[in-house]
UniProtKB/Swiss-Prot annotation:
The basal body constitutes a major portion of the flagellar organelle and consists of four rings (L,P,S, and M) mounted on a central rod. It holds the Pfam family FlgI. Residues 1-19 form the signal peptide. Transmembrane segments: none annotated. This is Flagellar P-ring protein. The gene is flgI. Keywords: Bacterial flagellum, Periplasm, Signal. Assembles around the rod to form the L-ring and probably protects the motor/basal body from shearing forces during rotation.
Amino acid sequence: MIKFLSALILLLVTTAAQAERIRDLTSVQGVRQNSLIGYGLVVGLDGTGDQTTQTPFTTQTLNNMLSQLGITVPTGTNMQLKNVAAVMVTASLPPFGRQGQTIDVVVSSMGNAKSLRGGTLLMTPLKGVDSQVYALAQGNILVGGAGASAGGSSVQVNQLNGGRITNGAVIERELPSQFGVGNTLNLQLNDEDFSMAQQIADTINRVRGYGSATALDARTIQVRVPSGNSSQVRFLADIQNMQVNVTPQDAKVVINSRTGSVVMNREVTLDSCAVAQGNLSVTVNRQANVSQPDTPFGGGQTVVTPQTQIDLRQSGGSLQSVRSSASLNNVVRALNALGATPMDLMSILQSMQSAGCLRAKLEII
């Protein structure tokens, strides 16, 4: 009766507040994907394959494949092939994958092929880090890009040297699983957070009894489970559907230095400050002045004299006030009022954080 009342109170509290399921915040330790890789050949290309004179490994791979099929290529034969390409094939072996199950594969050219459109991947073994074959891949490649070339001009949309084969590999070997062994399981938070880890442990203890879950650190919650696969599956199904109140996220600003993009979450706040940003531009203009003699047969020489002009300009630099902002919309308005470009905004945010005006973590990727 006490457990029922506790569960009812927890349900009413989580319904009134913003809550998320435990399954959306955590994953089960040990239940993960495993990467597979393989090397193979793509055939059937419309003259867009590897130039075999520049990619000898393509010819060598083709000779090995033909010899396995009982076809012997005379030594010294120079095969000029345009419809074959050497590729790398990658896939992910899902957790609890069983023999006969199909998985998607990604095919990427490793030579100088122009396009893989219309090609067919020949049977390719996919291996794990232990060099064991776990799947076999084969099938027609779907390329999302398009392109055409003629007379030295070319037009291309998206990428042509990579494609995907849906359900293109069949699992041939299963990975041993430790699921169901032991009386404890670890739930791992997607993002480390001490308060969230403790809150999840408290939620499980209120419903399943105190001592059922323990927060080990900011990312790991250890849960006591019954023995046996079926019992643990039912226990996890109940736990993962429990809801917990989501704690506020850490204020963070992420800057991509390569693209100039700036992303911030709603917890970012600003304190009042003054910002001055000046743009410094340098323009170098170089011209060649040609000096020729006035008389054609006077014995003079033509002289080329380079003339270089450097122009230095500095604009902006006026001091502007930034008001204190507590919401994301106000932060955006305050930063837009500066009239800075994304590249300028990156340096402004760094300076604001150093001055203590930006209440957020600054992450540059």
